């Protein structure tokens, strides 16, 4: 459960949130709407632990996974399919542990990492990411192209696919 009590959040001299109080139960779906600059992105950054409070209390369970769509348009040479798979940070952490175990030639750590990789859905990640991209209007023949090669609208859809790839509560 997420609890905000009398939260005050500022960006510069202007208050974005003042005396905000809300409880969000596990499994509850919440939409965040408001005008530009009213603090929607800042509130999400607060919930992800990326911003500090200016006042009040914010309780977010440590194990909670929150997915959100980045507003910034990615402009990199990384393939769009990899950008989407990056949304599953647990899977990427598992891949990193596997690579480290291979570099150390640690067979036990490799076996543990491979077991975790399977549990994380690593063997199906690429096909799941491709299905998300296909469903959002991408030409599946182009999913290995750099994300920078796509229009702004398609790059925003890639951000949506990345958020959908993230296992979240």
Give names to the regions the model predicted.
Residues 1-169:
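ABC ATP-binding cassette signature C-motif
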């Amino acid at each position: 459960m997420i609890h905000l009590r009398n939260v005050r959040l500022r960006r510069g001299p202007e208050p974005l949130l003042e005396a905000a109080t809300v409880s969000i139960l596990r499994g509850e779906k919440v939409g965040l709407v408001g005008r530009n600059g009213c603090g929607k992105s800042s509130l999400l950054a607060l919930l992800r632990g990326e911003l500090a409070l200016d006042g009040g209390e914010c309780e977010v369970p440590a194990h909670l996974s929150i997915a959100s769509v980045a507003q910034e348009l990615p402009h990199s040479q990384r393939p769009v399919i990899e950008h989407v798979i990056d949304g599953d940070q647990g899977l990427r952490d598992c891949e990193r542990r596997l690579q480290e175990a291979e570099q150390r030639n640690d067979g036990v750590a490799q076996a543990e990492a491979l077991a975790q990789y399977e549990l994380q859905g690593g063997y199906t990640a690429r096909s799941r990411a491709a299905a998300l991209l296909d469903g959002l209007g991408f030409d599946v023949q182009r999913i290995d192209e750099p994300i920078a090669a796509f229009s702004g609208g398609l790059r925003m859809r890639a951000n949506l696919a990345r958020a959908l790839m993230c296992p979240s509560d």
